[in-house]
Amino acid sequence: MTRINTAPPAVLTDEHLFAEWRELPRVLRLALDARPVPARYTLGAGHMRFFLPRLGWLGRRHAELTAELLSRGCALTPRPPLPTDGGDWEPDDDARRVNAGRLVERLRGARRPMHHRGVVVPATFYDHLLA
């Protein structure tokens, strides 16, 4: 599974932030595949493919994730920056709602405690994103 969230990196748990930073570059591997791109933000099948015409947004998102991880004191393996030219995107309310629901679901179903800046967060930590 590859996570690409719409929530600002600053509100993600440490675990979700690092997972997205690590997994987001996987989308670039799909660029040579000719299957159709979904018209709307989706989770599951088509999630990564949705971002192919939006690679500029992905590059900027990855830079934001990197900056947030560094601000939290994470030691990262250096990676070349992703390109920031190309298609842009602004998540609409529907995309934010879908993503918030998934974040809430993952946090509530977590087997181990999750953290924000090293502090354990309650299962309701992401509930404000649903409003």
Report each predicted region and the residues it spans.
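Extended, charge-rich alpha-helical interface modules
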Residues: 1-131
